[in-house]
Amino acid sequence: MTRRSRRVAYVAKACVSCARSKQRCDGHSPCGRCSLKNLDCVYRHLLQKGQNSTRGASPQSPSASRESYSQNTLPVVQSQTRPLALDSAPSVYSPASEAIGEPPSLSTDVGNNFVEMSMDSGQETFPDGVSVNNLTFKIGESDLQGWASLGVDIPWNSSMHSMLDNPLFELPDPMAFFFQSPSELLGQSDVQAIPCPMDSEPMVHQLECETPTPNFTHSLDISSYQGQSNQTSPETTSHSSVRDDAELESWRAEDYGHVPDINDEAYQVMVFTFEQLNSDNVYCIPFTDKHLPSLQHMQIYMQVYFEEYHPIFPLLHKATFSPNKDDWLLSLAVSSIGCLFSKTLRSKEVFPIMQEFLRRAIRIQTSTPSISVAQASVLNQIGMMYGGDLRFAECAHETMAQLTTQCRKIASSSHNLANSSIAENTVSQGWQAWVRAQLEIRLFYCAWLVDSQQVGFFAFSSTIPIDFLQFPMPINEYVWGMSTAETWQNSLAEDSSSQQLTSLRQVLMGLYRYREVPGQLDAFNSLLLVMGILNDLSGLRHAHLYLEILQRRVETLPPTALTRAVMTNIHMVSLLIYFPTREVIAFGRWRVTEAQHSIVTEKLKRWMSDTRSARAALVHACSIWSQVRLSRTNSHHEPPALLYSAISIWALVEHSEEVVENADELPILRLDSLNQDVKLWAAGNEKKRLYLSGVGLLAHRGALARLISETARLLEQRIAWPQAWRTGPHLKQSYAESRRVQ
């Protein structure tokens, strides 16, 4: 029986509500969907026989508490035939399923960009396959190695060729290097006029003359949504508290007291939603056989987040952060990141479970988007992209559009953005109103920052254009860190550096035209400028000069973890100017043919004939490698930065054409730090013996083997992000393959 004939027969037996919505119906009276959504369940053939419509709850349905959450906990899934069933073993990663058959036509509206992917519709369902949204996925033994299934709400039906297309020689997707087994591709891959400005970029005039880009604050037609229920479930799951003495001591050591603890009411909402989304019903399938971590553990993870991760990613306002029932989703997101850095037993094992729970919980939100939900989406985006599981990474690329939509809706209905500048009228509004406005601004800039890093580090297509950010850049860290309204007001009155910056595009235009940055620029805003330069990289002629200006500015800032992270990003973008992401990965022999590798190698050799460019790239690569090795920051960008720097050093050393006679008589130049001697060597022609701490002399016969071994050790043992754990073995395998071929 064909799929079309089955579908006709199936819909004919559906109730009126399911048939009208084209949803799955189990045929019961009432059906499971109508029971869970508290809808009238009517069958036409029963009415024709004179029977009355049925309304009510299923005998198996819970009481009023479950009904109160039904609108928020049940996702809408269309055109599904049956759930995608994967194993729920405790392993963190597994290969992605391969699409077979011919997928249907897809149209996606991302921000202001309408993308259409035309594909034919498949006609068969294979015996060992599953069908989701008219797409058939083949499930083999290797596909059943994962820690949990991702459920039917994963957007498997969208190919990734928009970010993998390469007109030269179809290099592989760089993101594939960071995961256990990459999936096969489905296809191919207002600046004021100031007299006498300096010689500027051609794109400055182009940007000034372009039609203005619509921004986040343009009004949108926002439909009214039903608010979340205030009821909590009386049903709770018993979770044992921490009993092991060693684990108890770890808990006490990590009780930093940065923010208030999660209250029991908020935790019960988490437990109830977890049970709903981890149940076996017509809307989702279980993804784990584990329990949600105990309340005590969730509190640990939240404190660790503000100790380890908040200083390098200041999305939240620590002084006013309140983990209450209304913002339980944000509390869950914070804990899901904090568990990576906790020293308590088995804390890293719960990371994939919490990320999948968070992903599902965000997806079913139907109320008007709030700041806390969007903030949770940003953290979930980071957790999935750098979580080491290819399926999560594919979801992260798809759900970036959902985050963009959340930001647009929040901005369009906001009354705070127009009053977000630091002025007397803002002070008179009060601290809470100012914090609210700044939280919105930081949300939008952090979402754009995450998107830009994915573009640079994984060659993704951009989802949030930089010109959407037409509001002031975030306030500096000093004012943002104020813990009371009194100290906040004093800082505004006394500190001139607390004045608000203009928009990111305006600051970039000033940098391009006059080669200067505002004097009040702090570390976080410097990072935004670095990513802005990366965004404009293809149209800039002097990108390295602008990065050097930012580097000199960052060197004057206090030596914090965020400052070190900004320096690493500066060197990373500088390296990508010379050695693009795709070519770095292709040189590492990851999923390329010998012909493709030869093309990359020959191109590299021709480029290295320019000694100064080759030396500059080597200096930046060594700076990245040394900074991550000696002063880790726990930032999510460190796994790709360490990997790219190691492969770049490998390539530049192996194919260097600098012939040195009597090398033992030459002075040694250490590339661990970017001092004046290193800069002079990079800009000149003087010969040196190059030394890198942890590797030794780079010209030594075994230097590259030591480089790869040390890099793999750092990735597997020293970096907290799961992506790094997956990358180390790949790097060793690639180097071994290279030695074998040679």
Swiss-Prot record:
Q: Which one of the record's GO molecular function terms can you name?
A: DNA binding
Location of the region described as Disordered in the Swiss-Prot/TrEMBL record = 50-80, 218-244
A single GO BP term for this record reads: DNA-templated transcription
Listed Polar residues bias regions: 218-240
Known DNA-binding region = 15-41
Q: Gene Ontology cellular component?
A: nucleus
Tell me where it resides: Nucleus
Inducing stimuli: Expression is negaticely regulated by the global nitrogen regulator areA.
Source superkingdom: Eukaryota
Pfam families associated with the record: Fungal_trans, Zn_clus
Observed phenotype of the null mutant: Does not affect the expression of expression of DMATS1, FFUJ_09176,and FFUJ_09178; nor the metabolite production.
* InterPro entries membership: Transcription_factor_dom_fun, Zn2-C6_fun-type_DNA-bd_sf, Zn2Cys6_DnaBD
Which keywords fit this entry according to its UniProt record? DNA-binding, Metal-binding, Nucleus, Transcription, Transcription regulation, Zinc
**Keyword NADP listed:** no
Where does the UniProt entry say this protein principally localizes? nucleus
Tell me, in a sentence or two, what this protein's role is: Transcription factor; part of the DMATS1 gene cluster that mediates the biosynthesis of a reversely N-prenylated monomeric L-tryptophan (r-N-DMAT). Seems not to regulate the expression of the DMATS1 cluster.
| Protein's UniProt name | Transcription factor FFUJ_09177
Native organism is Gibberella fujikuroi (strain CBS 195.34 / IMI 58289 / NRRL A-6831)
